[in-house]
């Protein structure tokens, strides 16, 4: 399953929509909830300075759209 993690690069400032970034993780999980938990743990362990806003499971259609826009790249820690 592919998850899109929305985050701010620092926890020091208030979140702003304009500075929200995203990364993509390929998570092997048995449920959506387990995948979200694993994604959060991975980001928190490897990038503790990130302020995670939201974690979204990408549907096939949304994944295809993300690939078409050119912004899609799996992050590996």
Swiss-Prot record:
Q: Which GO terms describe its cellular component?
A: DNA-directed RNA polymerase complex
Highest taxon of the source? Bacteria
What top-level class of enzyme does the UniProt entry assign?
A: transferase
The EC number of this protein is 2.7.7.6
This entry's Gene Ontology molecular function terms read:
DNA binding; DNA-directed RNA polymerase activity
What keywords does the record list, in alphabetical order?
A: DNA-directed RNA polymerase, Nucleotidyltransferase, Transcription, Transferase
Q: Which reaction does it catalyse?
A: RNA(n) + a ribonucleoside 5'-triphosphate = RNA(n+1) + diphosphate
Q: What are the recorded Gene Ontology BP terms?
A: DNA-templated transcription
- Kindly indicate whether the keyword Transferase belongs to this entry: yes
Pfam families recorded: RpoY (PF07288)
User: InterPro entries recorded for this chain?
Assistant: RpoY (IPR009907)
Q: Which family does it belong to?
A: Belongs to the RNA polymerase subunit epsilon family.
What does the UniProt record say this protein does? A non-essential component of RNA polymerase (RNAP).
Subunit relationships: RNAP is composed of a core of 2 alpha, a beta and a beta' subunit. The core is associated with a delta subunit, and at least one of epsilon or omega. When a sigma factor is associated with the core the holoenzyme is formed, which can initiate transcription.
This one is known as DNA-directed RNA polymerase subunit epsilon
């Amino acid at each position: 399953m592919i998850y899109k993690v929305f985050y701010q690069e620092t926890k020091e400032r208030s979140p702003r929509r304009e500075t929200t970034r995203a990364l993509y993780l390929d998570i092997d999980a048995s449920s959506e909830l387990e995948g979200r938990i694993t994604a959060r743990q991975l980001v928190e362990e490897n990038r503790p300075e990130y302020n995670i806003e939201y974690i979204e499971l990408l549907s096939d259609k949304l994944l295809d759209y993300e690939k078409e826009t050119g912004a899609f790249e799996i992050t590996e820690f």
